[in-house]
Amino acid sequence: MKDVTDENRQNSENAIKTYVSVAFKIAASAIFAALVAAATLLFVIPIPATSGYFNFGETLIYIAALLFGPLVGAIAGAGASIADALVAIQYAPGTFTIKAIEGFLVGFLFKKIKAKTKSITLSATVAVVVGGLEMVAGYFLYETLILGYPFALAALEVPFNIVQMLIGLVVAVPVMHAVLRVFPQLKSQF
């Protein structure tokens, strides 16, 4: 009888942990989507040729994806479209898709590479670079195929997007390490 009671208690504790984990991820998704939108709006360097802009929301997408995984990363990425809906509406649909895919890719690749290499820094770096390159290619294709910008005009934004990715990488990886030192329990996410 005692074994059944212990098993029931363990099942209840696991159910509570799962519920808390799901609730925590939902909250983290909402918070990061809002933070990405705010960072995208507050720290802006316009690119007049394309009506696009350089911003620091990228960094928060990477942090969300690295710490909480692909789904939180995707939702955080989609948060950037909130900013575009306010300041560059023509980019909002593309941003929703491009940044959501970017956040998902970073979180997904980080988990997969980390499982094989055991190196958090290498895994994070590769994941961010691949996700960032998806963002660069995604905006280039969106501007040429959807917005109808000439190839040369869309190409003007490529270096800005690469710098945005690199700044995000240089900031996000150390921040991830710092957060994991303070909250080591987050390592269970990956």
What are the roles of these predicted feature ranges?
Residues M1-F190:
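Loop-helix junctions at membrane interfaces
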